[in-house]
Design a protein with these regions (language model features):
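ADP-ribose/adenylate-binding Rossmann-like module
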Residues: 56-69
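Active-site rim elements
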Residues: 143-150, 200-203, 228-229, 290-300, ...
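Active-site beta-strand termini and strand-to-loop segments that position acidic
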Residues: 214-220, 244
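Non-transmembrane alpha-helical segments in soluble domains
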Residues: 1-4, 26-29, 51-54, 77, ...
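C-terminal helical cap and adjacent loop that interface with cofactors, partners, or active-site loops
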Residues: 161, 211, 232-317
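N-terminal glycine-/serine-/threonine-rich beta1-alpha1-beta2 phosphate-ribose binding loop
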Residues: 1-58, 74, 78-86
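Predominantly a Rossmann-like dinucleotide-binding segment in NAD(P)-dependent oxidoreductases
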Residues: 83-88, 93-205, 239, 248, ...
């Protein structure tokens, strides 16, 4: 309803709707006038919808996480190769201003040899549990209760994997992953909902730890630390740290040290001084459309840039 209201407000033609039942989306794939499909649905539908879209001859762009199992990931890869259709995971955090700056710093060699990175998705989202019948919490909450690990890794690992050139000269080798006890969401359910509510009757044994920490080693010997926490009462952060032999950048808040360029290696460069370095090392993509992206919104402009890049790449073949 919200999407249709936006279309009407913009005075654009009302699009076709496919929502008669939970299989009606397959009817949409039968259309001959569709080139690309965006999959923005509950997690468990991402991979099946992606595979079906490519088999129908369309390119597919899938929200994170792109799949829930190793088998589903291989299904997407095999289908993309078989059908020669594009299959892209829509990781918007790779297109934020700070993330693009970091990528440029790394590619220009400003930070020296890259040694270590940190990423995370720390976002207190317990209130989503109030979406019981419809909405994000209605389908995400059971995942938290029944699965343990980092269920949403790519917001943190996506950008730093780009910095390190993962699968472009290096690759992940092995990892060690641990989770804390599962406490926060069970306590929230008991405090906010009656005893006979589905969150207190159907989800009686919560296994997903409140915070997960994973240490990854690459083939070239570099290290990464990844965290995920959508439960604990703490401020938002994606960490976004990249460390090299000549400097380090970290986010939340954005701060930078470059040996021989910033004032000291014992203190972060922040604020107005950092903005000067932003101007010097701004990524070409942000220089090109950063103002337009910011004006159009979407997580500070990153959504706009990601979608702009999708369409631009498709148009250029």
């Amino acid at each position: 309803a919200k999407a249709f209201a936006r279309v009407e407000k913009a005075k654009r033609p009302v699009p076709a709707s496919y929502g008669k039942d939970d299989q009606d989306w397959k009817r949409m794939l039968e259309r001959k006038d569709l080139d690309i499909v965006f999959v923005v649905t509950p997690w468990e539908l991402h991979a099946p919808m992606g595979v079906a879209t490519m088999l129908a001859g369309k390119h597919v762009f899938i929200e994170v996480p792109i799949a829930l199992t190793v088998e589903e990931n291989w299904q997407l890869v095999d289908t993309a190769e078989k059908t020669q259709r594009h299959c892209m995971m829509l990781e918007n955090t790779c297109y934020g201003r700070e993330e693009l700056l970091c990528l440029n710093l790394c590619r220009l060699g400003v930070l020296g040899e890259l040694l270590h990175a940190e990423g995370a998705y720390i976002h207190e989202l317990r209130s989503q549990m109030n979406n019981v019948e419809h909405g994000t919490g209605s389908w995400r909450t059971p995942h938290y209760a029944k699965r343990n690990g980092n269920l949403y890794p790519t917001h943190g690992i996506g950008p730093v994997a780009q910095y390190l050139g993962i699968n472009r000269g290096d690759r992940f080798d092995y990892l060690s992953s641990v989770s804390s006890p599962a406490r926060g969401r069970e306590l929230y359910a008991k405090a906010k909902f009656p005893a006979n509510h589905r969150w207190n009757t159907e989800l009686t044994s919560w296994v997903g730890g409140d915070i997960n920490t994973s240490i990854i080693k690459t083939v070239r010997g570099r290290s990464l630390m990844m965290q995920w926490d959508e439960t604990s009462p703490r401020p938002y952060s994606r960490l976004n740290l990249i460390q090299g032999t000549k400097g380090t950048f970290a986010s939340y808040p954005g701060r930078l040290v470059i040996e021989g360029e910033t004032k000291s290696t014992h203190a972060w460069t922040e604020g107005a001084t950092l903005e000067t370095l932003f101007k010097k090392y701004e990524h070409p993509l942000w220089k090109k459309i950063g103002d337009l992206a910011t004006a159009n919104g979407g997580h500070g402009g990153m959504d706009f840039i990601m979608l702009w890049r999708v369409i631009t790449c498709l148009r250029q073949g």
